[in-house]
């Protein structure tokens, strides 16, 4: 019996963004790069070899893959578990957690004001 290759997460399957290590510019394939006339939908690997960072001029080898911006983490078959939280991206989960903490803080602050 042959072993199956390891499954990839949804973030790994998505077209990854690439960040310039020199200046922090993020190349997002779905947006392309208007400054250098790269059309939207062009993956990073398909960029010309002489393409440079539009902000600082760093070569392509200064870029690292950072994954998709709003891709949910985890595997596709697990997205329906966890009251829908598995479908949230990391940023949305952070907003939910810290937003809830802020509301709780305001609640306790209002109790303090009543006393």
Swiss-Prot record:
Rubredoxin-like domain sequence ranges: 15-66
InterPro entries (alphabetical): Rubredoxin-like_dom, Rubredoxin_dom, Rubredoxin_ET, Rubredoxin_Fe_BS
A UniProt-annotated Pfam family: Rubredoxin
SUPFAM superfamilies assigned to the protein according to its UniProt record, in alphabetical order: Rubredoxin-like
Cofactor note text: Binds 1 Fe(3+) ion per subunit.
PROSITE patterns: RUBREDOXIN, RUBREDOXIN_LIKE
Xref: CDD domains: rubredoxin
Domain of life where this protein originates: Bacteria
Keywords: Electron transport, Iron, Metal-binding, Transport
Obligatory cofactor(s): Fe(3+)
GO molecular function: iron ion binding
Record-listed Fe cation binding positions: 20, 23, 53, 56
Family statement: Belongs to the rubredoxin family.
Its biological purpose: Rubredoxin is a small nonheme, iron protein lacking acid-labile sulfide. Its single Fe, chelated to 4 Cys, functions as an electron acceptor and may also stabilize the conformation of the molecule. Could be involved in hydrogenase-linked redox processes.
Protein name in the entry: Rubredoxin
Encoding gene per record: rub
């Amino acid at each position: 019996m042959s072993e199956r290759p390891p499954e990839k997460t949804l973030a790994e399957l998505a077209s990854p963004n690439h960040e310039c290590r020199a200046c922090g510019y993020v190349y997002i394939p779905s947006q392309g790069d208007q400054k250098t006339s790269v059309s939207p939908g062009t993956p990073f690997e398909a960029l010309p070899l002489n393409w440079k960072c539009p902000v600082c001029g760093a070569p392509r080898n200064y870029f690292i893959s950072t994954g998709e911006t709003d891709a949910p983490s985890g595997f596709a078959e697990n997205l329906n578990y966890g009251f829908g939280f598995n479908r949230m991206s990391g940023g949305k989960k952070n907003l939910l957690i810290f937003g809830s903490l802020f509301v709780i803080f305001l609640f306790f602050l209002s109790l303090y004001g009543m006393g």
